C-alpha cells in the first residue's frame, strides 16, 4: 500500500450512517464541519488544477495534480507554496478526482515527507459552491475556533458535556448534510472562556460575544 493510502486511512473510517456520509464504492467518510476540516488539516488552500499525472508508486498508483495556488489559509509553516497535490488514483481508496483547467477549488490536506496528500475524507469543494460565511470562516473565524470542539449529534437526545463544545445538529435536519450550521456558523471561544456558535459578517466583538444561536 502506498504512503498516500496509509495517510488517508488515518482520516477516513467506516460510518454506519451511510445516508449522511460521502460514499465512493469502498470509501466512506464521517461528516465533518468545515471548521473541523480546517483545523485538522496541515494545508488549506484555494487553487486551480492545471495538470495531472498518474504516478506508478504502488499497486493502484497515485494521482499527482499540479496546482496553481491562489491563496493559502493554513500551512504557512509547513509549505508556504504548494505546487503538487497527491491522492490515491482509486476512489475506493478515497482518491479524489479534480477537473483540470476548469474550476478553482478549496483544498485541504496533510503534509507527509514534504508532500501534500488529500482525498475524499478531506474537505475539497469548488470555490463557487462555498457560502459567503464559509469564505469568511477561512479568513477569520475558523482559526479562532481551533481550540473548540464541534460535537456531532446524529440522534436525540444529545448534549454538550464541556464548555469548549458546540453541538452540531445538521444531521438531524430533513435537509441533511451539509446543513445550516455547516454553511453559516463557526464555533468560537468567547471571552468568558466557553465556546458557542457564531454567525455574522464581521469578526466577533463585545456586541456579539454572547451569541449562542442556533
Swiss-Prot record:
Signal peptide: 1-26
Disulfide bonds: 27-94, 29-121, 39-146, 148-195, 153-158, 166-187
Chief subcellular location: secreted
Region Involved in metalloproteinase-binding, annotated ranges: 27-30, 91-92
Keyword Cytoplasm found: no
Domain of life: Eukaryota
Gene Ontology molecular functions: metalloendopeptidase inhibitor activity; protease binding; zinc ion binding
Subcellular location: Secreted, Extracellular space, Extracellular matrix
Site, as annotated: Involved in metalloproteinase-binding: 40
Similarity field: Belongs to the protease inhibitor I35 (TIMP) family.
Protein name according to UniProt: Metalloproteinase inhibitor 3
Organism of derivation: Xenopus laevis
Gene name of this polypeptide: timp3
Amino acid at each position: 500500500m502506498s504512503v498516500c493510502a496509509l495517510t488517508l486511512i488515518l482520516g477516513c473510517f467506516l460510518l454506519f450512517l451511510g445516508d449522511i456520509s460521502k460514499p465512493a464504492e469502498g470509501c466512506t467518510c464521517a461528516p465533518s464541519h468545515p471548521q473541523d476540516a480546517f483545523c485538522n488539516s496541515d494545508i488549506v488552500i484555494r487553487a486551480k488544477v492545471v495538470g495531472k499525472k498518474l504516478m506508478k508508486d504502488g499497486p493502484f498508483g497515485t494521482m499527482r495534480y499540479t496546482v496553481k495556488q491562489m491563496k493559502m489559509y493554513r500551512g504557512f509553516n509547513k509549505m508556504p507554496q504548494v505546487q503538487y497535490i497527491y491522492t490515491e488514483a482509486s476512489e475506493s481508496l478515497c482518491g479524489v478526482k479534480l477537473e483540470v483547467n476548469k474550476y478553482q477549488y478549496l483544498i485541504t490536506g496533510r503534509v507527509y515527507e514534504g508532500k501534500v496528500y488529500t482525498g475524499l475524507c478531506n474537505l475539497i469543494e469548488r470555490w463557487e459552491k462555498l457560502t459567503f460565511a464559509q469564505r469568511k470562516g477561512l479568513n477569520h473565524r475558523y482559526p479562532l475556533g481551533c481550540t473548540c470542539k464541534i460535537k456531532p449529534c446524529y440522534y436525540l437526545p444529545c448534549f454538550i458535556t464541556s464548555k469548549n463544545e458546540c453541538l452540531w445538529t445538521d444531521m438531524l435536519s430533513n435537509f441533511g448534510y451539509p446543513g445550516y450550521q455547516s454553511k453559516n456558523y463557526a464555533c468560537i471561544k468567547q471571552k468568558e472562556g466557553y465556546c458557542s456558535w457564531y454567525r455574522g459578517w464581521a469578526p466577533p466583538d463585545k456586541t456579539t460575544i454572547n451569541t449562542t444561536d442556533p
